[in-house]
Amino acid sequence: MRQLFGIDIGGTSVKWAVVSENYEFGDRGSVPTAFVSADQLVDALAALVGPYRGQVVGVGISAPGGIFSYEADPDGTIHRGGALPYMDGFPLGRVLRERLGLPVTVVNDGKSCALGEYAAGALRGVDVGCVAVIGTGIGGGIVVDGRVLMGAGGFAGEFSFLSNNVNEPLDHCDTFATSSGWHGLQNLVAVELGISDEAELEALDGRRIFELLEHGGASEVAAVQRGLDAYAELFDRVLVNLQCVIDPAVFAVGGGISCHPALFEALDRKMDDVMAHYTGFLKDMPRPHVVPAQLGNDANIYGAVATCLQVL
């Protein structure tokens, strides 16, 4: 059975694993992303793969930034660089391929997550599916017939930039990222709890929010639930818009705060409220089917390996 080397380059760490073509994990590890140049990153990646060069048949990399498909750009050039601005314009795929003598593919991290969930997670067996990852913004991707939808400029699936309110002047502070990234939940819950102190707000992370929901006093539980419901309704409204455009069979939602079942209970409950507004000739509007993503922090490695398998 063929073995591949999967790499997930993040802003704080580089995770790696040796993965079979059936998505079984072998050796794995991580190193800090303590690099200041593209050359340093390449040296580190080459050092990680080096001991396995005789064992693996290819290297799949998930990375931040704008990245075209392998067919459109086999050099795996990273545009913008995302969390690693020094990678802007760097042909990571070509440079590492020449260094290692192995096939190398590079895919955007959000798209990698979507393809990973298709290969081995919540989107298995689905013809059209979407993944939305709740972080600082909303990462994600769209999978159609087993391939990630790239779009004409590689920008398909960049859900963070969707505008929330078309009746207001354009404002980067009124996007799906700001309303539905985890800070959006933090801010809504803080308002309900009457928190304005910066230190208190900083302490109100996802873990604390759900801790209060489960173990807080009656007034705290009610306040957190109101904030969570408001967050869920904003999230669901965007999913309904995406349903109209893409019509996926499944939306898989992942990210740190998605681990708590209370989030999905709120998303399901508020989706009923949102869909109740679609009446008359709109009553047959399909209800978005929202499920938890399944692969957690490994999703990008799964997707990186799946991308590499597509070109071997």
Please give the residue ranges for each predicted region.
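A cytosolic small-molecule/anion-sensing beta-strand core signal
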Residues: 20, 63, 144-145
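Hydrophobic "anchor" residues
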Residues: 24-25, 78, 148-149
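Glycine-rich phosphate-binding loop of actin/hexokinase-like ATP-binding domains
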Residues: 124-180
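General beta-strand structural signal in soluble alpha/beta enzymes
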Residues: 104-109
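Short clusters of small/polar residues that mark proteolytic maturation junctions
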Residues: 30-32, 83, 153-154
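Short beta-strand segments
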Residues: 8, 60-64, 131-137
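A charged helix-plus-loop insertion that forms the helical arch/lid used to bind
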Residues: 73-89
